[in-house]
Amino acid sequence: MAILDRVELLERFVQKRGRWCASIEYEWRCSHRALDLLSQVDAQVRNMCGQPIQPDHGDYVDIQLLQDQMRAPGDKRTKHLGEAETIVLIRRRAELAGSIFLTDDSGARTHAAAEPAVNRCLGTTELLAYFEVAGWVTRNVVHADLRALQEADRRVRPSAARDYDRMADDLLLRMKKASRCL
């Protein structure tokens, strides 16, 4: 969301419950510098996520096992570390049970979706659809964001506007049905 300048929308979405683990915070520090994002964006993200959650000694074995399952031959040693750490912390920490896991990594999404402690797994396009359904952005703005992500070589799915439209329309329909059941 930072690359799209949508951090304030992500803040609204997480409702002061955003959290991150130490490895994800480290990845943020590296990408923050690489993307040359403003320090204001860094402050927003840090305020939204709070202090990084540090794994304890008991977490490391599970993190390593999950990371090994996620990595492919030839992947860097740190590949999927942040995702594995996040999933294990959600699994092992009662206060994190029911969390929404945010990632565009398809392998991590598969593992998170199979984790009973994870409520939902959302990627960038799903978040944008939630923002649209909430009335925080328009569909045209989202289409422009999808183009910007493609131009920045970000791999998000769906990336085509018509596929996004179908997903957003489905979400809107589900939300309307859910509100009728209340």
Task: Describe the predicted segments one by one.
Residues 1-100, 106-182:
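Active-site-proximal, substrate-binding regions of enzyme catalytic domains
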